Amino acid sequence: MAEKNERAIKVVAENRKARFNYAIDDTIEVGIALTGTEVKSIRNGKTTIAESYADARGSEIWLINANIPEYLQANRFNHEPKRPRKLLLHRKQINKLIGAVEREGMTLIPLKLYFNERGRAKLQLALAKGKKLHDKRETEKKRDWSREKGRLLRSRG
């Protein structure tokens, strides 16, 4: 039997500031509804999701403010770079996320945009709560101390 052409997960965009600015409670993998030129542009790797967030509009969840630049080889049928994009979830997942956002004051933050093994664009969405300034400082102190410990152990060993 012929061997399958296996693809690894390819992370295209990552929101690195999210783990510093938010206390992440839960993560979920969601699909994203895209046009053809958007998929091609994402594959080029110029996408940014750092300033983006997800919001409930009606009974659907949308990705707001994600920047997927226009595909350079496309002609007049190109897409709008910062348009809202629909996220694809099951109804129970949507209800759970909407409930957490409305009742508990949580926020939906995208962490990663990637292509899975089947070549589909997926988004790792986090249910998070914003950190206060003193929490951010504490996180930074812990990170600095762990780096310093590593340096001390390496210099001794």
From Swiss-Prot:
CDD domains: SmpB
GO cellular component labels: cytosol
Cellular compartment(s): Cytoplasm
Record keywords: Cytoplasm, RNA-binding
BP terms from Gene Ontology: trans-translation
GO molecular function: RNA binding
NCBIfam families the UniProt entry points to: PRK05422.1 (NF003843), smpB (TIGR00086)
Function as written in the Swiss-Prot or TrEMBL entry: Required for rescue of stalled ribosomes mediated by trans-translation. Binds to transfer-messenger RNA (tmRNA), required for stable association of tmRNA with ribosomes. tmRNA and SmpB together mimic tRNA shape, replacing the anticodon stem-loop with SmpB. tmRNA is encoded by the ssrA gene; the 2 termini fold to resemble tRNA(Ala) and it encodes a 'tag peptide', a short internal open reading frame. During trans-translation Ala-aminoacylated tmRNA acts like a tRNA, entering the A-site of stalled ribosomes, displacing the stalled mRNA.
Similarity comment text for this entry: Belongs to the SmpB family.
Protein name as it appears in the record: SsrA-binding protein
Gene source species: Rhodopseudomonas palustris (strain TIE-1)
